[in-house]
UniProtKB/Swiss-Prot annotation:
Source organism per UniProt: Acaryochloris marina (strain MBIC 11017)
Pfam families linked to this entry: RadC (PF04002), UPF0758_N (PF20582)
The entry's keywords: Hydrolase, Metal-binding, Metalloprotease, Protease, Zinc
GO molecular function: metal ion binding; metallopeptidase activity
PANTHER family noted in UniProt: DNA REPAIR PROTEIN RADC (PTHR30471), UPF0758 PROTEIN YEES-RELATED (PTHR30471:SF3)
Protein name per Swiss-Prot or TrEMBL: UPF0758 protein AM1_4368
Entry's family note: Belongs to the UPF0758 family.
GO biological process, one term: proteolysis
UniProt superkingdom: Bacteria
Positions of Zn(2+) binding: 184, 186, 197
Length: 243
């Protein structure tokens, strides 16, 4: 695609809005999604809206990170330093980013059945996703795996959390839950478990066996993604739970 070509000069099948309607948003490039928000082009060389979207992404790729990661936390003053992005375009982008965060953080209502790691991660996203510090939280469930509530047990630093099995089980017992899923976030966005994560999970599984309070999973959340330790490790085989 020629980025200086006007959107209206493109065949309809190549126009971002028409492609979104015909094929769905997931088939659009990052630049095309930005183009829909921007509406019109500008910037160096009088770029099209798609070209301006690509220019924005290239600007943020100079941070040696995924430009979407940088864009997630950008502010209006940073956006308006980019040629072609004025206050109107900047606020549209920021509003879309914030709406996306809120949708990601929306959690199911209480008494929803938590029968899948993705449902559990969605229920905890509001507490854990996009946080700059590590947080450790617990999903409190009844015997039918229905959600009774969520509880943040501890807040740590940018690189570690300070959760202790004693504090976690105290919350589970205090709230009258009979099943639990624990989770924490990695501010780095990486969801691979650390040796400390695995060690804590082993301790929790052993404690859950003794107390008769099955631990259903331990999730690690980051950058809109998650890892289920029950699905990716053998810890539950080594320390079976009455699920």
């Amino acid at each position: 695609m020629t980025y200086s070509l006007r959107i209206l000069d493109l065949p309809e099948s190549d126009r971002p809005r028409e492609r979104l309607i015909a094929q769905g948003a997931k088939y659009l490039t990052h630049a095309e999604l930005l183009a829909i928000l921007l509406g019109t082009g500008q910037g160096p060389g009088k770029l099209s809206a798609v070209g301006l979207g690509q220019h924005v992404l290239q600007h943020f790729s100079e941070h040696q990170q995924d430009p979407l990661t940088v864009l997630r936390d950008v502010n209006a003053s940073e956006l308006t330093t980019i040629q072609g992005i004025g206050p109107a375009k900047a606020t549209t982008i920021l509003a879309a980013i914030e709406l996306g965060k809120r949708i990601c953080q929306a959690r199911p209502p209480e008494l929803t059945v938590i029968d899948d790691p993705a449902v559990a991660a969605a229920a905890l996203a509001g507490e854990l996703m996009w946080q700059s510090q590590e947080r450790f939280a617990v999903l409190l469930l009844d015997v039918k795996h229905r959600l009774l509530g969520t509880q943040v047990v501890s807040i740590g630093t940018a690189t570690e959390t300070l959760a202790h099995p004693r504090d976690i089980f105290r919350e589970i017992i205090r709230k009258g839950a009979t099943r639990a899923i624990v989770a924490h976030n990695h501010p780095s966005g990486q969801t691979d478990p650390s040796p400390e994560d695995l060690e804590l999970t082993q301790q929790l599984l052993s404690g859950a066996q003794i107390l008769g309070l099955p631990l259903l999973d331990h999730l690690i959340l980051g950058n809109g993604d998650f890892t289920s330790l029950r699905q990716t490790t053998s810890l539950w085989n080594d320390c079976p739970q009455d699920l």
